[in-house]
Design a protein with these regions (language model features):
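Predominantly the C-terminal beta-signal and adjacent terminal strand-loop region
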Residues: 27, 173, 187-241
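Flexible, solvent-exposed loop segments that connect beta-strands
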Residues: 54-75, 107-128, 161-171, 207-226
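Residues that define the transmembrane beta-barrel architecture of outer-membrane proteins
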Residues: 36-40, 78-82, 127-133, 147, ...
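Gram-negative (and chloroplast) outer-membrane scaffold detector with strong preference
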Residues: 29-38, 46-52, 87-161, 235-241
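Bacterial Sec-dependent N-terminal signal peptides
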Residues: 1-27, 238-241
Length: 241
């Protein structure tokens, strides 16, 4: 009798387990989509531009007042910009892809200069429209039903198309750096959508010290206040592939 009870309980548990497993396993959309040798897509989102500043701390004589002034620069706040671009993806293996994602990122950086002794303040906004060319390796986890997390890492170069001369600050047009990020692919019946966050860390100094473009030399003190400025950017995007 006990054997029959155990057998019935065992069959019941087996059936219930199979039912639960069937509930957790869903029909996979685009089951072979990740195995294409190459594919293309678009990316669209927001960016927040920043800059890692190194102040010189050196005093300078104001040509108008004759006073000695020491200015320090900060970026006190951030405003969102717009990013749009293309995606070219090359399959390497089931867990790794090589990606080229050229994009345009429109935005600005708000600088505030504060004079140390007299507490004078000066604010200016520098517009930066970056044509970016990142090359990344995309490393993916195992796919679970219709989503698949991933991380990215790579390098980028960028050309600033929005620079204007005769401004309080002049930035060099070219910069380069490294990128890291993460996201998650969501597989829909005919398209794959991925929310992604990307961190871009510049490596070169873009503050132009040779200000031959200035017509108002009283602005030179703001360039002199900085010895180094390295761009940084956070980009939130949705990728459609």
């Amino acid at each position: 009798m006990n054997k029959k009870v155990y057998l019935i309980l065992g069959l019941f548990c087996l059936l219930e387990g199979s039912n639960l497993f069937a509930q957790t396993q869903k029909v996979k959309n685009q089951p072979y989509g990740d195995y294409k040798l190459y594919h293309f897509g678009i990316t669209i989102g927001l960016n927040f531009q920043d800059m890692l500043l190194t102040n010189s701390g050196l005093p300078a004589i104001n040509s108008e007042t004759g006073k000695e002034e020491t200015w320090f620069a900060t970026i006190p706040n951030y405003s969102p910009g717009f990013t749009v671009g293309l995606i070219a993806d090359l399959f390497l293996n089931p867990y790794m892809n090589l990606r080229f994602t050229p994009s345009l990122s429109f935005g600005d950086k708000a600088f505030e200069f504060v004079e140390q002794e007299f507490s004078e303040r000066f604010k200016t906004t520098i517009r930066s429209n970056y044509l970016m060319a990142p090359v990344d390796v995309k490393i993916r986890s195992m796919r679970l039903n219709n989503y698949r997390p991933y991380v990215i890492a790579g390098a980028f170069s960028a050309l600033d198309l929005g620079l204007k001369k005769d401004e309080p600050l002049l930035l060099k047009p070219m910069n380069y750096g490294i990128t890291i990020g993460l996201g998650c692919d969501f597989y829909l019946p005919i398209i794959k959508i991925a929310p992604e966050i990307r961190f871009c860390f510049g490596l070169n100094n873009v503050v132009e010290k040779n200000r031959t473009d200035l017509t108002d030399f009283s602005l030179m003190k703001y360039s002199d206040a900085l010895t180094r400025g390295v761009p940084r950017m956070i980009i939130f995007t949705f990728n459609f592939e």
